[in-house]
From Swiss-Prot:
Outcome following mutation: residue 759 to T: In strain: Dresden
Name of the protein this chain belongs to: Non-structural polyprotein 1A
Effect of residue 659 to P: In strain: Dresden
GO cellular component, one term: host cell membrane
Listed result of changing residue 143 to L: In strain: Dresden
Xref: Gene3D superfamilies: Trypsin-like serine proteases (2.40.10.10)
Organism of origin: Human astrovirus-1 (HAstV-1)
Length: 935
């Protein structure tokens, strides 16, 4: 029968080619058009199975074969479908491990492609939004009016020039004469020479008399520094030469005038203030008082300074009266404005009166300037109440923060010692297990999870509506299924079979919420925080500044036991939902027995209520109605008993059906326990108290350490281990249990199973056959041990000696040794063992003398041999437990090595190859070269 080409739904299906090729050849166009909706570009497995194994079939059609397709569907399920001739019918899924692995990878790749597509669409949308925003930004910038360059009016320029001219006129501050002649120059030169000579004479006299004062030393140092750091021909000397004609106020007023004209928002008011302060002579004393003034009080001050230029007494009188008049005439103002105006008038009065006093006494207002600055600093110091003050710009933005506390820069260890004090508390260590954490990745975002038992626990809002989520653990990605989500914000995921965490967290049996520890992975870094917690019903709150991605993290106590699952983040405090052991499993429906018990209680309650009503209220009813409605107590009890009897009978039948295989064995005479010490005699006795068990749990010990401690405590309580006879096996007595009590045995009868005891080969005749035996091939001789036989044994030997001699005479005959064919599986090196040497009876005392005296085991040899046996046993047990048999060759190697060191036969023997050479095979080509002959 000719078949068509194999059918492949896609290129991946052709590349993988899972299943039977013959089944693919059976595909017809009708079958192809009716195929289920498998995942696009995914492989399928085709099977050609007997019809009777799938559908109920009788007759010849039982052995007909049908095509079965297995693959992944678009809805995310895995299924198998068989074609019954009309359509594809779903059957129980056939597990193809390679197909399932491939579908898992394809599903993950499709999910990543979908996420990539959504990310690209989102990126394109965001890029378009950015372009729109850029265009809108450019359009709005064009709509903003550009500030015009500031124009300075000519009148202010002229006023500034006048002030500059006034400040630069030396005037009365010059120190040079106007009329200079040759005589005046000669007089000045002579005067300078005379002063210089006088200073030199005074200096020499002081040096001679040693009468040098501190002022003389300071003058000398100043001259040295002047000539050392400033050369004689330098531009600084020229600048200072011309500056000394002016006072500090002239220079300062010149700078202020230029700055006011260029940058001031009110140049007129500022220039008028500079001019009046210069004309009145108050000068620098005016500047510290300007912050206390308002616009009105500033013009009052300027007016009084102009008045002072003409009549100082009138100006002083008006300045003193100004605050009094202001208090009276400005009382209609608002409080804030009223206070500001009065403060400015008081500052004006202080300036005019104090300036006049300073000018009269000292001729300058420098002292008043210093006093006003000192008052301002004291006022600022009284404002510094907080630990720091903030400096803001015009928009209210904080540009700097200055601490008010005075910091000792040089000797600050005294302050630190005083602040630190003495430690009165000790912080405890907490147990954390980073290996029990993982990252939960969903299309909506990422969260944290932890391993507990066979589940992965996380927050329910992290999982969302997803049925499968990705679990990232130690750089690998796994897919886990959501198993159960209780009413709390908790989700339980089934741990994948190929995921083996290094640690797992356990629930706390005695929860302590006073101090909690939160640990999670944030940006692939482990973060841990400890804080005090408060309980609010089923939730916890703690002052921890948690971050996004920590939802689902475990909240543990100091022993590393889980208390709750992290849930919320408010920026300052974190919240968690408390987890209980009952949350791990869904609430089970009540069993049939419980339902019956509830029904009985309900019927009893109804019966009691009916009885009470019957005793309190009695009404006349017809006899027919009474016959229909009256129910006695006995009837209700009988109904309940009947229902309970039926249900209990059903329950007993089910239990008997389950226990039927175990009830067939009858009780008989057994020998269980014979030949060994009884075990578990202390079973049922508590070896650990409740306090000891709780203490071990609170220490957070792992399973191995916990078991070691229990074994140690049991050993101390018992005093000695249980003894077990190694030569006794329960399998030897299995046949006794099949015999009933009604069977009688004849214990004197000897049953022969045709299993004769082998007779050891005679050792004396061997010496006649082989007169010169080799030393290595001699059998082991136990004659070194002194013979100690009882009287009974000697009598038995004497009685059997004649029979033995007759048997030896019949057996001992010279037999010519013949060659025996080699065994198919035998050792190919060393001498053949003498098998007769192994055929002898020996007891425990004989075993001590098997080896010759020089080769007997010492205590050290026993220790070394015991360590090797323990090592081999550990390797084998570890391989069996972990199902990793790659270490077994190491055990075989150690066994061969020990046998080689002891001179014994190795565990592995080379087997002679059964491959025989062909009949005409001449062997390998000779490489020795041609033969050379000599003549």
């Amino acid at each position: 029968m000719a078949y068509g080409e194999p059918y492949y739904s896609s290129k991946p299906d052709k590349d993988f080619n899972f299943g039977s090729t013959m089944a693919r050849r059976q595909m017809t166009p009708t079958m192809v058009t009716k195929l289920p909706k498998f995942v696009r570009n995914s492989p399928q497995a085709y099977d050609w199975i007997v019809r009777g194994l799938i559908f109920p079939t009788i007759g010849k059609t039982y052995f007909q074969r049908v095509v079965v397709i297995t693959g992944g569907l678009e809805d995310g399920t895995y299924g198998s479908f068989a074609f019954d001739g009309k359509e594809w019918v779903g059957i129980y899924p056939i597990e193809h491990l390679n197909l399932m692995s491939s579908l898992k990878l394809i599903h993950k790749a499709n999910a990543l492609q979908e996420r990539l597509r959504l990310s690209q669409e989102e990126k394109a949308t965001l890029a378009l939004d950015v372009q729109f925003l850029q265009h809108e930004n450019v359009r709005l910038k064009e709509m903003i009016p550009k500030p015009e360059p500031r124009k300075i009016q000519m009148k202010w320029i002229i006023m500034g020039a006048v002030l500059t001219f006034l400040s630069l006129i030396p005037g009365g501050y010059a120190h040079s004469q106007t009329n200079n002649t040759i005589f005046t120059d000669m007089i000045a030169a002579c005067k300078y020479s005379t002063e210089t000579l006088t200073e030199n004479l005074d200096l020499r006299i002081k040096l001679a008399l040693a009468n040098i004062t501190i002022s003389d030393k300071l003058d000398a140092v100043r001259q040295i520094l002047n000539f050392a750091f400033v050369p004689r021909a330098h531009w600084l000397r020229t600048v200072f030469y011309y500056i000394h004609y002016y006072e500090m106020w002239n220079i300062f007023m010149f700078v202020l005038a230029i700055g006011t004209v260029m940058r001031s928002a009110r140049p007129g008011t500022d220039l008028v203030t500079l001019a009046t302060s210069h004309l009145s002579g108050f000068r620098m004393a005016v500047l510290p008082t300007i912050p206390f003034h308002t616009t009105m009080t500033l013009w009052v001050m300027n007016t009084l300074m102009v008045c002072y230029y003409f009549d100082n007494l009138l100006a002083i009188t008006l300045a003193i009266l100004a605050p009094i008049l202001g208090i009276i005439f400005l009382c209609f103002m608002e409080d804030s404005n009223y206070v500001s105006q009065i403060r400015g008038l008081i500052a004006t009065a202080v300036l005019i009166a104090g300036g006049h006093a300073c000018l009269t006494l000292t001729g300058t207002t420098t002292s008043l300037f210093v006093v006003i600055l000192t008052c301002r600093f004291i006022r600022m110091a009284t404002v510094f109440i907080g630990t720091r003050f903030e400096i803001r710009d015009a928009n209210g933005k904080v540009v700097a923060t200055v601490p008010t506390r005075i910091k000792n820069v040089a000797f600050d260890f005294f302050q630190k010692l005083k602040q630190s004090g003495v430690r009165v508390g000790v912080n405890e260590f907490v147990v954390i297990k980073p290996g029990a954490l993982c990252v939960i990745d969903t299309p909506e975002g990422k969260g944290t999870g932890f391993f507990s038992g066979n589940d992965i626990v996380t927050a329910a809002h992290v999982v969302g509506n997803n049925t499968f989520v990705n679990v990232c653990y130690e750089g690998l990605m796994y897919e886990a299924k959501v198993r159960y989500m209780p009413e709390k914000d908790i989700a339980f995921l089934t741990c994948p079979g190929d995921l083996h965490p290094t640690a797992r967290l356990k629930l706390s049996k005695n929860p302590d919420y006073s101090c909690v520890t939160v640990m999670a992975y944030v940006n692939e870094d482990l973060v841990v925080s400890t804080a005090a917690a408060m309980v609010h019903g089923n939730t916890l709150s703690y002052a921890v500044r948690t971050q996004d991605g920590m939802s689902g993290a475990p909240v543990c106590d100091k022993y590393g036991r889980v208390l709750a699952v992290h849930q919320t983040n408010t920026g300052y405090t974190g919240g968690a939902v408390i987890i209980d052991p009952a949350d791990f499993h869904p609430v089970k429906a009540p069993s049939q027995v419980e339902l019956l018990k509830e029904e009985i209680e309900r019927l009893k309650a109804q019966l009691n209520s009916a009885t009470e009503n019957a005793t309190t209220v009695v009404t006349q009813q017809p006899s027919a109605a009474l016959e229909q409605k009256s129910v006695s107590d006995s009837d209700v009890v009988d109904l309940v008993r009947t229902a309970m009897e039926r249900e209990m009978k059903v329950l007993r039948d089910e239990i008997n059906g389950i226990l039927a295989p175990f009830l067939q064995k009858k009780k008989g005479k057994t020998k269980h326990g014979r030949g060994r010490v009884r075990r578990n005699l202390r079973k049922g006795v508590k070896l650990l108290t409740e306090e000891e068990y709780r203490e071990l749990l609170e220490k957070g010990l792992d399973r191995e350490t916990f078991l070691d401690l229990i074994d140690r405590i049991i050993g101390e309580r018992s005093g000695y281990p249980d003894y077990d006879d190694e030569d006794y096996y329960d399998e030897d007595d299995d046949g006794w249990g099949m015999v009933g009590d009604d069977v009688e045995f004849d214990y004197t009868e000897v049953i022969n199973f045709d299993q004769a005891k082998p007779i050891p080969a005679p050792r004396t005749t061997k010496q006649k056959i082989c007169p010169e035996p080799e030393v290595e091939s001699q059998p082991l001789d136990l004659s070194q041990k002194k013979e100690k036989q009882s009287e009974y044994e000697q009598q038995v030997v004497k009685s059997t000696k004649p029979q033995q001699l007759e048997h030896e005479q019949q057996v001992v005959k010279p037999i010519k040794p013949q060659k025996s064919e080699p065994q198919p599986y035998s050792q190919t090196y060393g001498k053949a063992p003498i098998w007769e040497s192994y055929d002898f009876d020996w007891d425990e005392d004989d075993a001590k003398f098997i080896l010759p005296a020089p080769h007997r085991l010492t205590k050290a040899d026993e220790i070394v041999l015991g360590s090797k046996i323990v090592k081999l046993r550990t390797i084998i047990e570890t391989a069996i437990k972990t199902q990793n048999y790659s270490a077994l060759p190491e055990a075989v190697f150690e066994l061969d090595k020990a046998a080689y060191e002891a001179g014994l036969e190795g565990f592995l023997q080379r087997v002679k190859s059964k491959n025989k050479a062909p009949k005409n095979y001449k062997g390998p080509q000779k490489t020795k070269g041609p033969k050379t002959t000599t003549h």
